[in-house]
């Protein structure tokens, strides 16, 4: 993947501080599998730099979205109501604050570390 000229590698870059000067062009696809930070804190800069019609594929990890007091032993969120609330909150944020259209969410067929339930999200930036 690194050898593909269409891919911009930004290793050791804090995505919260992405700027247009760091990218050779406006991205048309953003893929996010982040840990230890919520999507709401991590993605605004990248989403703002994306071109109209861009696609977002993100992994929602409830253990990094809920408050520390709601994460169980071993860093696992076991409450299915909390899972749904996290997905609802991320969708609301993307659609309301970021003005992206969420096309689909689904439970990831692959569990996270130690069985954490995670969710995939597909969204598109309006034309």
Ranges and model annotations:
Residues 99-109:
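Conserved S-adenosyl-L-methionine
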């Amino acid at each position: 993947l690194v050898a593909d000229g269409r891919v911009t590698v930004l290793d050791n870059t804090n995505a919260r501080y992405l700027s247009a000067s760091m990218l050779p062009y406006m991205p048309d696809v953003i893929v996010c599998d982040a840990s230890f930070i919520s999507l709401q804190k991590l993605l605004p800069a990248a989403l703002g730099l994306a071109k109209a019609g861009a696609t977002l594929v993100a992994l929602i990890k409830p253990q990094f979205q809920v408050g520390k007091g709601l994460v169980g032993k071993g860093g696992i969120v076991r409450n299915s109501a909390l899972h749904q609330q996290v997905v609802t909150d991320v969708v609301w944020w993307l659609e309301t604050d970021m003005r992206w259209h969420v096309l689909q969410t689904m439970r990831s067929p692959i569990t996270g570390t130690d069985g954490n339930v995670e969710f995939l999200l597909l969204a598109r930036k309006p034309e």
